[in-house]
A protein has these predicted regions:
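Hydrophobic alpha-helical membrane segments
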Residues: 1-255
Length: 255
């Protein structure tokens, strides 16, 4: 991590980094202009593939109470296939944070990372699924277990981009993501609470608000990643946003 391309990430891990929730959300709002349609189409593509594959799993399993080993294997394959597409949604946000154009078919760009992403997805699923059963086992309400589950989900938000952008192994990406979260957990939690409120408004608008809420969520995550880690996998030469520069001010945006 002593290479120049890791300088921002190294600084964030050693000295911390600054996040202004209002400034980040404001910049994200600016950056979704001109990108809402491809982001929505990409999201629909991922959801569509997930629904088709899971319907296939339900069809094969039938009404059996216990899934056969063949069905379990198919479920594992589905998780492996979906991991690069899920990671692609994160990378679309990173692209917009770097002032790059995005494409709906970008969801198919990261299958070369399928092995580390699939392994990471399974580990992350295990980590985020521990708390509710644990709370039930000690007689607590499942709502109590939802709080650490949400925090763990937020803490792992850097994981997929670290694998694709930095070339980290699954364990390196997970531990690094947790360390980054510990540096700015209050700001990260606050930002996600604001995004939850945005999604609540989207639901109350009979779904129309998702046209803005989904791109805002993805681009916000991309900006946070840029601020904490820098962006190495994209050519930043012609971009006005330098990933190793100080965070943009509230009054200046490149979108």
């Amino acid at each position: 991590m002593n290479e120049p391309r890791f300088s921002r990430l190294h600084t964030s891990l050693q000295q911390g980094f600054t996040l202004s929730p209002n400034a980040i959300l404001k910049e994200a709002w600016q950056r979704i202009h001109g990108a809402k349609l491809p982001i929505i189409l990409a999201t629909l593509g991922v959801v569509g593939v997930w629904l088709v594959l899971n319907q296939l799993l339900v069809t094969i399993s039938g009404d059996e109470e216990e899934l056969s080993w063949e069905v379990n294997l198919l479920g594992l394959v589905i998780s492996m296939l979906m991991a690069p597409m899920t990671a692609a949604l994160d990378m679309i946000g990173v692209h917009r944070a770097a002032d790059k154009t995005v494409r709906p078919n970008q969801i198919f760009d990261y299958f070369k990372f399928i092995v580390p992403l699939a392994i990471t997805s399974m580990i992350m699923g295990l980590l985020t699924s521990l708390f509710i059963p644990l709370s039930l086992s000690v007689g607590l309400s499942p709502i109590v277990g939802m709080i650490p589950t949400m925090l763990m989900s937020i803490a792992l938000m850097f994981t997929f981009p670290l694998i694709i952008d930095k070339g980290f192994t699954p364990l390196q990406a997970i531990t690094t993501s947790l360390r980054l979260f510990s540096r700015q957990w209050v700001a990260l939690f606050s930002i996600h609470i604001m995004l939850v409120l945005v999604f609540v408004v989207a639901i109350l608008s009979f779904g129309i608000g998702f046209i803005w809420a989904i791109p805002l969520y993805m681009v916000t995550k991309g900006i946070i990643y840029r601020q904490a880690c820098g962006i190495d996998s994209l050519d930043m030469t012609n971009s006005n946003q330098d990933p190793t520069a100080t965070p943009p001010s509230k009054d200046h945006f490149d979108a």
